[in-house]
Regions:
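N-terminal substrate-binding region of glycoside hydrolase catalytic domains
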Residues: 28-46
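N-terminal small/glycine-rich loop or linker at the start of catalytic domains
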Residues: 1-13, 66-78, 111-113
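A short, structure-level motif marking secondary-structure boundaries and short turns
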Residues: 9-11, 39-41, 78-80, 116-118, ...
Length: 258
């Protein structure tokens, strides 16, 4: 299993001005001994070429890569056309950043505040993701939503969207146990679409079940260790990561009869 630790896991430190993306790269590489960066876009200082290329240089110097770019404030759908346009422009900026940084996957939310989708919303969302997929294909990464909030927290909406977009560079960021409908079955229904994952602290008691599900569907991406509390983040992330990794190692040992 490959692991990543989203920079969002340190959003408390970031809000206090105690960590930026350069410090995050150091933290992931030398505190947690990972080569994978998992960037939350709200930690970008700008989209200027000079800044983004400095980030890329910092990654290359540490022999790191970007497993995922997690994009907020760029949701595809909003009922307000002006906000839709604003989010679209932000989405394009982040896709360009993903290309410069060499990201493997990009999460851009579906938007929509309710589980129900109008025909207008669905058609617009499908077409926008098709556009994003064309860019992703050109630059060698996957793109799609997370079951994060609103419309995306219904596995049936995810299924319909995946089938309608119908593109090899489209998939989802699967946030375990984060559904408003089909709460018991959502992960199982949508795991096959996943290109990246978020495993929160509250899912740790069921970590073995989630890891088994990923193996069952042939998942090749990273297990993203996302922490949310904003408190004692270095130690909390260390516990969460170590527990998930130990669970996986015990599962593999059991298979070998060790």
């Amino acid at each position: 299993m490959k692991y990543s630790i989203p920079s969002y896991s340190f959003h408390g430190l970031h809000s206090e001005g105690k960590i930026d993306l350069f410090g995050y790269f150091e933290t992931v590489k030398y505190r947690y001994h990972l080569d994978s960066a998992d960037i939350w876009n709200m930690m970008f200082k700008s989209f200027d070429d000079d800044y983004l290329r400095k980030l890329r240089e910092a990654l290359d110097e540490r022999e790191m890569y970007v497993a995922n770019l997690c994009v907020d404030a760029a949701e595809v759908w909003d009922v307000d056309p002006e906000k839709r346009e604003q989010f679209y422009r932000n989405g394009l900026d982040n896709l360009r950043a993903a290309a410069i940084l060499g990201a493997q996957t990009v999460r851009i939310d579906m938007g929509g505040r309710t589980l129900d989708m109008s025909e207008e919303q669905f058609e617009y969302t499908v077409n926008r993701y098709k556009e994003y997929c064309a860019f992703a294909e050109e630059h060698g990464f996957m793109v799609g939503p997370e079951n994060h909030w609103g419309t995306s927290r219904d596995p049936e909406n995810i299924r319909k969207l995946v089938e309608a977009v119908d593109h090899p560079n489209f998939g989802i960021l699967l946030h375990f146990e984060n559904w408003d409908s089909e709460k018991e079955n959502g992960d199982r229904l949508c795991a096959k679409y996943a290109f990246h994952t978020h495993l929160a602290a509250w899912v740790i008691p069921n970590c073995d079940e989630k890891l088994a599900l990923l193996e069952e569907v042939g998942y090749k991406g990273h297990l993203g260790i996302e922490h949310h509390s904003s408190k004692n983040e270095y130690s909390q992330v260390a516990w969460q990561y170590a527990t998930a990794r130990n669970t996986y190692n015990l599962m593999q040992a059991k298979k070998l009869g060790v």
